[in-house]
């Protein structure tokens, strides 16, 4: 993923714009990607330091004018993202250093003019004890240092695909500095919406979803700390949401960003058609929700869990996207479930207002005790309920509540 400093932009008043990628620029990006990809493939088995040096030499050899150096660095970064490095045992490396340094200290103390300290001999002895070579011992001394990690594989995107997705990669980097994003999306396949909404929840973003007149949705996105004006702490999540948004048939984004060294507030807009950056699966459930699902499925009950999120729309009031639904085997009764556990009180009250406006679905909301919202606020609504939990979601308590809702 690109960082904000690698994006080539222009300012027009209070608007931030990307430099357009025309045919000439796209061909240039593809050529750079091909050059850097070739270097990466040739260095499989080399250290990260050796690869980085070779990539830097390759960049210098392109002899680009100053205005193009940022583009070169951006392509280099995207190619580097396709590299997989070994993850050495840090404890083993530290233990090896202690042993070799202890031996070296003892050897230097015992050395004399007639019998000087012999580093090579020390490494050979240590290697013999470990049934390896002196070269392997020396390489292992600092194997836990990033520069010494070895490139295991290169699985970067084809140069043409990297060039085709370059503008989207730049837009993703701009969103690292976003404080708020409004997206308009439209897709023919309901599964695209489900994957998008699940991705937003997985990223701990707070989507405000409304049905649009064209059959799509308008989505407002804030991070959980958006109440602190100007915070870009959740810019990474906003950036990571872009591929799921761009998978829709048509989409557009309007963002408020803080840009430059002075963090000047600017507006940023980008739009397009369906773009597949890479093959991806639907994101996994958050850990706390996955743990609950596992616990619930161990219960002896008549209910099964459907993990394909539904889109519950109350025209004129808003949209709710539960995390999952419980379905009773004997009669097909369905109760939706949404975890609002550690989000904001504002999000919880939005759901309460949606229910009070007449949401025509049975639904249970699980809310963290820390949000200070009482279960009684929905006592007079027979088709919806709040379940307040302290640390973990108790499967038996949820079962009791969905049984009551199903009976309503």
Predicted regions and their residues:
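Electrostatic, structured charged patches in enzyme active sites and in nucleic-acid/phosphate-binding
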Residues: 1-408
């Amino acid at each position: 993923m690109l960082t904000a400093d690698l994006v080539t932009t222009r300012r027009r008043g209070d608007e931030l714009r990307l430099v357009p990628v025309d045919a000439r620029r796209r061909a240039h990006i593809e050529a750079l990607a091909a050059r850097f990809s070739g270097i990466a493939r040739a260095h499989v088995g080399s250290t990260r330091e050796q690869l980085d040096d070779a990539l830097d030499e390759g960049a210098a050899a392109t002899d680009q004018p100053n205005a193009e150096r940022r583009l070169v660095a951006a392509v280099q970064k995207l190619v580097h993202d396709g590299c997989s490095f070994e993850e050495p045992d840090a404890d083993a490396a530290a233990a090896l250093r202690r042993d070799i340094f202890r031996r070296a200290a003892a050897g230097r103390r015992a050395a004399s003019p007639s019998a000087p300290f012999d580093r090579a001999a020390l490494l050979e002895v240590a290697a013999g004890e470990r049934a390896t070579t002196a070269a392997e011992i020396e390489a292992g001394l600092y194997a836990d240092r990033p520069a010494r990690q070895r490139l295991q594989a290169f699985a970067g995107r084809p140069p043409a695909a990297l060039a085709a997705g370059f503008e989207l990669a730049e837009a993703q980097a701009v969103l690292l500095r976003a404080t708020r994003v409004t997206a308009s999306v439209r897709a023919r396949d309901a599964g695209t919406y489900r994957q998008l909404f699940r991705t937003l929840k997985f990223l701990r973003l707070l989507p405000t979803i409304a049905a649009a007149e064209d059959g799509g949705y308008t989505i407002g996105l804030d991070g959980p700390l958006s109440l602190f004006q100007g915070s870009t702490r959740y810019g990474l999540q906003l950036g990571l949401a872009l591929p799921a948004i761009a998978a829709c048939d048509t989409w557009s984004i309007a963002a408020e960003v803080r840009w430059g060294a002075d963090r000047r507030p600017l507006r940023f807009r980008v739009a397009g058609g369906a773009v597949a950056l890479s093959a991806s699966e639907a994101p996994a459930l958050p850990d706390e929700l996955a743990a609950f699902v596992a616990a619930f499925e161990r219960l002896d009950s008549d209910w099964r869990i459907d993990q394909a999120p539904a889109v519950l729309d109350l025209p004129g009031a808003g949209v709710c996207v539960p995390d999952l639904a419980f379905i009773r085997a004997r009669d097909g009764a369905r109760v939706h479930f949404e975890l609002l556990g550690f989000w904001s009180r504002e999000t919880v009250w939005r759901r309460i207002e949606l229910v009070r406006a007449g949401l025509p679905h049975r639904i249970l909301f699980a809310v963290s005790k820390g949000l200070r919202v009482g279960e009684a606020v929905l006592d007079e609504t027979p088709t919806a309920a709040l379940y307040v939990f302290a640390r973990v979601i108790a499967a038996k308590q949820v079962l009791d509540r969905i049984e009551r809702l199903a009976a309503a």
